[in-house]
Amino acid sequence: MVDVNRFKSMQITLASPSKVRSWSYGEVKKPETINYRTLKPEREGLFDEVIFGPTKDWECACGKYKRIRYKGIVCDRCGVEVTRAKVRRERMGHIELKAPVSHIWYFKGIPSRMGLTLDMSPRALEEVIYFAAYVVIDPKDTPLEPKSLLTEREYREKIQEYGHGSFIAKMGAEAIQDLLKRVDLVTEIAELKEELKTATGQKRIKAVRRLDVLDAFHKSGNKPEWMILNILPVIPPDLRPMVQLDGGRFAASDLNDLYRRVINRNNRLARLLELNAPGIIVQNEKRMLQEAVDALIDNGRRGRPITGPGSRPLKSLSHMLKGKQGRFRQNLLGKRVDFSGRSVIAVGPTLKMYQCGVPREMAIELFKPFVIREIVAREFAGNVKAAKRMVERGDERIWDILEEVIKEHPVLLNRAPTLHRLGIQAFEPVLIDGKALRLHPLVCEAYNADFDGDQMAIHVPLSEEAQAEARLLMLAAEHILNPKDGKPVVTPSQDMVLGNYYLTMEDAGREGEGMVFKDKDEAVMAYRNGYVHLHSRVGIAVDSMPSKLWKDSQRHKIMVTTVGKILFNDIMPEDLPYLQEPNNANLTEGTPDKYFLKPGQNIQEVIDSLPINVPFKKKNLGNIIAETFKRFRTTETSAFLDRLKDLGYYHSTLAGLTVGIADIPVIDNKAEIIEAAHHRVEEINKAFRRGLMTDDDRYVAVTTTWREAKEALEKRLIETQDPKNPIVMMMDSGARGNISNFSQLAGMRGLMAAPNGRIMELPILSNFREGLSVLEMFFSTHGARKGMTDTALKTADSGYLTRRLVDVAQDVIIREDDCGTDRGLLIRAITDGKEVTETLEERLQGRYTRKSVKHPETGEVLIGADQLITEDMARKIVDAGVEEVTIRSVFTCATRHGVCRHCYGINLATGDAVEVGEAVGTIAAQSIGEPGTQLTMRTFHTGGVASNTDITQGLPRIQEIFEARNPKGEAVITEVKGTVIEIEEDASTRTKKVYVQGKTGMGEYVVPFTARMKVEVGDEVNRGAALTEGSIQPKHLLEVRDTLSVETYLLAEVQKVYRSQGVEIGDKHVEVMVRQMLRKVRVMDPGDTDLLPGTLMDIADFTDANKEIVISGGIPATSRPVLMGITKASLETNSFLSAASFQETTRVLTDAAIRGKKDHLLGLKENVIIGKIIPAGTGMVRYRNIEPQAINEVEVIEEAEATEEPAIIKE
């Protein structure tokens, strides 16, 4: 066997008959499988041991030779080689076909490769191959055309006319094989190249296609006649197994049936040929053989599929590879693993951030080999078998050993669906009683887990390296930031938020107000003994607090705070300021001076003069976490998060907040507000009946009236709410619920959407406290049901989008430090109309500059060229009034097969510069796909019938962008740079004409009458600018402008969709995806290169080909950039393994085989498929050959011969 981690590339070609014979260990002559009495394989049958190897290890068929000592001997009685039974997975056989047979992939695929090679139509080929017509192979002196078809009758007539042997015509695959042998590739290619110089239209397209196929044959060294099979390989028997079921019946792979049919027909054909049977009978048998081989290779591709029992189509070789259940996706890309388990999850509020609770009975099973090794080492048992029995009996001593074994041995927890890399994280196991896995509450957000019955899977990394990687790269405590936007993903929620909110509340006039304490302990003691309330404002000596970054003017003073805030600040990292107010100024600049007593001031007066601060809400906690991370990185942050969690749980328990129906307030003036609205609606309807407004206007006015009524109720609700009301506290703190939920409980439910998406005029006037009437209930259930179905559909769509995104970008890896490009991307804030969707500051953070940035007024250099822009630097640049900056970007990176560190910038998940080997393509795909489920599914209708453009938004728009489809509601763009000189309306054709005057000429654009104009007369427009509202078609923009403009446009469009839904995604992720869509060019004129016109190729390969020609003084080729959708881009990737495992498996493999494609295994997917370590992170080639050195030699435990189990060797 080849060492799987050492080889460089993998090639696929057509197999020549001699190649197939060299693979084979013998010919399969009989259709038999196994003997029904002995259940042993039949001789010369499909499971023959002589051909494929023994069924039992080191044992021949007749039993003469048993045991390993006869290794390699061929038995003289039965002819079976004594070897491992595993060879039955790799030894192939063959069938000598008595008539040539065409390979259906090459004849039936689109485009038909056989047809293009011979310049015949697939229809004509089919007639010949399936014996419906003769084809003229050599007309000799007759006036017949070569390759022309003759029916049976015409053939007989021509024979009579010209005499026997005057010309050669045949039928069947044999005829095609003769024709293919006669193809002279070199002359044909030369002729086609000549023809291309003059050909146009359909002729040119066909010539380019033929040239492509012929050139592929010529360059790869494949011979066209190998598309016809004379010998059929038989795959190893263990890959088409036959197993005995409980009832004595057998279950066999469908392939055996298909092979049996081929063998039966082949043998019958051989017999007919021996008997010199009449031509028509032989012909019919040959046709049946052809159909049998077709069914074996791809059942159902031509005609009706061959069916098994219960009219189920049999699974052929092609079906074994295709689709989700095929070899690629089922077994190569998704394997099941041992040392894994799954269970329901429960909350583990006492765990540390890096821990998870594992039930004892799960742990003992998962860590069994480690425990057994330790039992033997401590001599509790003499050998492995005895140790195993100890574990199975549940001996008391194993639990102590288990405790030691799991110490510092991380496990991986995974929750499906794994939408991004935070769906699998590593934890240190803690043994617990019970049967549920315990999960730390703060990692729930990353997993999107809750405890309503979710299940999670647990995996054990076995090798030292795997454990080290789990600990260093995947430990949950390290994953504070979300890779998609660099914001903390572990913000506390629910009870934790509520507890800290309650803790930091302030209240006037509570017991103990105005007391002064010497230090924290005294204050807490007073609180515990009931002398002072948690929310009372008291004084404390500043000097008793540890270094909290006090200003010099604040030292040695008394500070006004509350006992709750003293406790809250006690868990903060020491170097954060004392947090008194929930705002960024206090967090970054220090505690405000107004809370400190000047000498001689009365504390009560100071307290009375201070306003009551609002408590710390979820958002404020998020800011504190982000600031902590910025200053202290992961270790301190995760410790702080644990303290925050414990404090929150403790105080939300102490607060004892409960919710009852009495907590829902009654709005005093609800009846008046609703009465007024009814009155207004009546007036609107009156006006409509009198013909003063259209039905559309009336509808809009009525719905607006009810909307305003609901808002008035909401406003009144907010005005009258009691800040100590538990529901209000939950809502205000961000623990659960929002104002809209609250107003449905206490105000009114408001307007509902009807099944057709239109908003109904009848609002639901009741709220949930009053209760809904039956009709109101009916109206509201519709919305709830629609929500459920939408979510279900959206999840599937979003998952498929993620799969396509991962596929197109999986080979984008950080390959080098700096690509040295001189290009950059000019960026400014992304705007949508007047609104800013993404500010310049956000776009600059974590990127490298391309040129130095100067202050627009003073000219001072703010930051040099090729420098990393930090968060503070970005703010400084924007504050200076800079509006656009040229940065290094993935779009302009010159690295082949990936990106360089400088063009990418920082890794958002760590906040540091990205490392070489980071798989940024996969991260980008996950970052864009994961929030997909949060996007809406709908197409918005603009109110009224005023416009006919529906703006696609949400998930459908994202798919439209990434698949480069023509958008709905397409905008008209100008191809001329100049001034809009006139917009004329033509009522007869219901269109408008826009005239743009440029330097070189005038552009005239016809626009639909109903389209909303974006430009006015006198506006200056650039090439590619939109004249009307709507989405620009990117392919059209590419024709008018350059690649960079298209890339910038697509980036802005993606950001608009996500940001409008409140989802933030780093620009660089979108850049990675968009760059993959534009990495190919189409060759227009080959010049002096040997490129073919019309071929798609990588920009880098195209540039290389041109460089060579220019150096030798030739004419370089010209090309045009091509924008491909992500599905097309995945299928056009240089790796045939990756493309074949994605979609259209047979088409990809057919094409790759003819071209003799080489896969250089640069991406992640192709390496996973062949079981090689992936070329990212520690798997990069540069780290591949490092051998771990053992520091202390470990004794190897030998094992008694008597046991049947292999010894477990200590790592």
UniProtKB/Swiss-Prot annotation:
Catalytic reaction(s) noted: RNA(n) + a ribonucleoside 5'-triphosphate = RNA(n+1) + diphosphate
Keyword ATP-binding recorded: no
GO cellular component labels: DNA-directed RNA polymerase complex
InterPro entries registered for this protein in UniProt: DNA-dir_RpoC_beta_prime (IPR045867), DNA-dir_RpoC_beta_prime_bact (IPR012754), RNA_pol_asu (IPR000722), RNA_pol_N (IPR006592), RNA_pol_Rpb1_1 (IPR007080), RNA_pol_Rpb1_3 (IPR007066), RNA_pol_Rpb1_3_sf (IPR042102), RNA_pol_Rpb1_4 (IPR007083)
One GO BP: DNA-templated transcription
Oligomeric and partner information: The RNAP catalytic core consists of 2 alpha, 1 beta, 1 beta' and 1 omega subunit. When a sigma factor is associated with the core the holoenzyme is formed, which can initiate transcription.
Protein name, UniProt field: DNA-directed RNA polymerase subunit beta'
Keywords from the UniProt entry: DNA-directed RNA polymerase, Magnesium, Metal-binding, Nucleotidyltransferase, Transcription, Transferase, Zinc
Gene label: rpoC
Required cofactor(s): Mg(2+); Zn(2+)
E.C. number(s) listed in UniProt: 2.7.7.6
Residues binding Zn(2+) 1, per UniProt: C60, C62, C75, C78
Binding locations of Mg(2+): D450, D452, D454
Record's cofactor remark: Binds 1 Mg(2+) ion per subunit.
